[in-house]
Design a protein with these regions (language model features):
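N-terminal membrane-targeting/pre-transmembrane regions
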Residues: 1-40
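Short aromatic-glycine-enriched beta-strand elements
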Residues: 100-103
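Conserved beta-hairpin
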Residues: 53-85
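A membrane-cytosol interface segment of integral membrane proteins
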Residues: 106-138
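A short, sequence-level motif marking secondary-structure junctions
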Residues: 14, 88-89, 116-121
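Hydrophobic alpha-helical transmembrane segments
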Residues: 40-51
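Phosphoinositide-dependent membrane-docking surfaces
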Residues: 74, 83-98
Length: 138
């Protein structure tokens, strides 16, 4: 049985999607509550919806982030950027006290931030980093 673990942000994911829903609801409620004599031009409507869509795309990027460790290596999705790093290329994982997220360090001294593991998630983040460190070949 292959050893596969996936880590996703806890609180940040909930906050990202909740903010997206709240933003949409407030926009619709305000739009419906405006008096009839107040209306937006087409350009204003387009600008408003483009800004809302941009914010929703950003929030979805936070929510969809993950770190997946399997027998071959680590797969990282930070927002819309994807990395696949084999275990043989990984030197270790660093997460200092108070750090917002851990960092994967490669043998070439490249660094990949692991946004899916949020330091604010406390024990979950410490457990995830301990697991990832245990998988690095000696």
């Amino acid at each position: 049985v292959p050893d596969l673990r996936t880590f996703r942000p806890g609180g940040a994911r909930v906050v990202a999607y909740a903010v997206g829903v709240i933003m949409l609801v407030i926009t619709v409620v305000i739009g419906l509550a405006l008096p009839d004599d107040i209306s937006f031009t087409v350009a204003e409507d387009i600008t408003l919806w483009l800004i809302i869509i941009a914010v929703l795309v950003f929030l979805h990027g936070i929510g969809r982030s993950f770190v997946r460790a399997d027998d071959d290596g680590v797969e990282v999705l930070n927002g819309y950027r994807h990395h696949r790093i084999p275990w043989s290329d990984i030197q270790g994982f660093a997460m200092g006290s108070g750090a917002p997220w851990p960092t994967l360090v490669t043998n070439d001294d490249e660094r990949v931030m692991l946004f899916a593991i949020q330091g604010s998630d406390g024990g979950y983040a410490r457990e995830a980093v301990a697991y990832l460190r245990s998988r690095v070949p000696s």
